[in-house]
């Protein structure tokens, strides 16, 4: 997963720049989402991995995705994905593109994982702390439960992870004792 994110990042950034220039951010996001759905299909994957198929045939298949963006730019993007064999990273490109859109809108997506479900007061306290931490941004708060944390929280947004869980502290202690 991390490798695909690394591969996807320059494509997502370049596409976002192109989309922003043309004012078609949402249209490109929709096109990437449709492309990712097509590529998720087992038959499409078999076609794309078939060494007997020419790159032009593969681009033609992917071009069947209906899009509301500049067709020339779309086909150039598809040709680049196929030529560089980066089509498996399409879903990640779409995710990173959507992340870039949300950042431009001033929204920070945050996933808060706790050992047990947070009550309303705890959610409010965490939300307030996150809004202070990310001042000037709107915080989109999602919650998950992972009993393996034992206690505490793990907060994840983009490349930032804050592990304030009991499990994380025990793991850190174990690393310290081993060194």
From Swiss-Prot:
Subcellular localization(s) per the UniProt record: Cell inner membrane
Gene Ontology cellular-component terms listed: plasma membrane; proton-transporting ATP synthase complex
Protein family according to the UniProt entry: Belongs to the ATPase delta chain family.
Membrane topology, record value: Peripheral membrane protein
Name by which UniProt lists this protein: ATP synthase subunit delta
MF (Gene Ontology): proton-transporting ATP synthase activity, rotational mechanism
InterPro entries associated with the record: ATP_synth_OSCP/delta_N_sf, ATPase_OSCP/d_CS, ATPase_OSCP/dsu
Keywords: ATP synthesis, Cell inner membrane, Cell membrane, CF(1), Hydrogen ion transport, Ion transport, Membrane, Transport
Organism in which the protein naturally occurs: Acidithiobacillus ferrooxidans (strain ATCC 23270 / DSM 14882 / CIP 104768 / NCIMB 8455)
General function of this protein: F(1)F(0) ATP synthase produces ATP from ADP in the presence of a proton or sodium gradient. F-type ATPases consist of two structural domains, F(1) containing the extramembraneous catalytic core and F(0) containing the membrane proton channel, linked together by a central stalk and a peripheral stalk. During catalysis, ATP synthesis in the catalytic domain of F(1) is coupled via a rotary mechanism of the central stalk subunits to proton translocation. This protein is part of the stalk that links CF(0) to CF(1). It either transmits conformational changes from CF(0) to CF(1) or is implicated in proton conduction.
NCBIfam families, A to Z: ATP_synt_delta (TIGR01145), PRK05758.2-2 (NF004402)
Gene: atpH
Subunit structure as annotated in this protein's UniProt entry: F-type ATPases have 2 components, F(1) - the catalytic core - and F(0) - the membrane proton channel. F(1) has five subunits: alpha(3), beta(3), gamma(1), delta(1), epsilon(1). F(0) has three main subunits: a(1), b(2) and c(10-14). The alpha and beta chains form an alternating ring which encloses part of the gamma chain. F(1) is attached to F(0) by a central stalk formed by the gamma and epsilon chains, while a peripheral stalk is formed by the delta and b chains.
Pfam family of the protein (one): OSCP
